[in-house]
Amino acid sequence: MAMAERPRPGWASYQNPNINNCQDMGNSILLLLGLIVCINIGINLVTLLWSRIRILLHRMFHIICEKETSTSLGKLVQPLRKQTYPKVHLRCTMDPVKMTVTPPPTRRRYRHRAPPSRRARCPIAWAPDTDDEKPPHQHPAICSRHWNDSKDWEGFQSMQEVWEPWTQDGLEQPPQTIRFQPAVEARPLKSEIRSDQGLEAYVYTVNPPPPSPEALSHKNNAAGSGGCVEGEQAQGQPVSPSFLGPANVPEIPRRHSSGRIVYDARDVRRRLRELTQEVEALSHCYPLVSGSSAAEGTGKDWVYRPLKGR
């Protein structure tokens, strides 16, 4: 019985390692559960305190960035102080003259042009031409811009016969600052004036030079032999003294003033009216002789023909 009660040493050695393994497995499981609990608690704390943690992190990064920028600027200022260059200020300006002022041809393109009949009646503002070195052939006798219509020229031809004796002997220019050009092909004596602004005008002489006897004899010979009887009647009349009066200057219509007028238009119109009144007052001094009577050669230096009947 004593032998049966003794434990066997093999069984004891066999049971001891199993108990130790079980204890180790339980301890490891407890450790894992503890770690899981700790992680869960940490996550809960972070979620609860995230707003405050975010503010703290923002302040920390802001302070760190300011320190870095201050140190970088301090390093850049030192080499700039060693090499100092003068400051350059660039100022862009625009020339107002080039923006506003345009040449006269460009203005004429956008301006409403009147019909040729109206443009022929209106006078053009002009300035005296002081450039005497230019040859006279550069300026045409008739302005194509103002005499486009045939009707205007027909109305203007009424003055031709009055100026015919003077156009043939009009080579001598009167002592004036304005350059005059003689007529071509029995056209009225006139001159074309061009100002600096591109304006054009025609000026007629009031007292042109008297015609030479040769010009009158040439005209009398060309008149023909159709008016011999009238020439004899004209010879019986007393010969008036060779007095050269002012020419009949046509009335210039009123024109709207513009910024380009260089002279006083009212003064010019007033002088022209005085000249016309003087011509009417002295009209009785001029004998009314027809064109056929001049063919006989009465010895007169001039022939006056009124324009009222034309």
UniProtKB/Swiss-Prot annotation:
Topology term for the membrane: Single-pass membrane protein
Pfam families associated with the record: Spem1
Positions of transmembrane segments: 29-49
Keyword field contains Coiled coil: yes
Sorted UniProt keywords: Coiled coil, Cytoplasm, Developmental protein, Differentiation, Membrane, Spermatogenesis, Transmembrane, Transmembrane helix
Coiled-coil annotated residue ranges, if any: 262-286
Tissue specificity of this protein: Testis-specific. Exclusively present in cytoplasm of steps 14-16 elongated spermatids (at protein level).
Region: Disordered, residue numbers: 215-238
Chief site of localization: membrane
Gene Ontology terms: cellular component: cytoplasm; membrane
Compartments (UniProt record): Membrane; Cytoplasm
Outcome of gene disruption: Mice are completely infertile because of deformed sperm characterized by a bent head wrapped around by the neck and the middle piece of the tail. Lack of Spem1 causes failure of the cytoplasm to become loose and detach from the head and the neck region of the developing spermatozoa.
Domain of life: Eukaryota
GO biological process, one term: flagellated sperm motility
UniProt-listed PANTHER family: SPERMATID MATURATION PROTEIN 1 (PTHR34834:SF1)
Function: Required for proper cytoplasm removal during spermatogenesis.
This protein's name: Spermatid maturation protein 1
Organism: Mus musculus (Mouse)
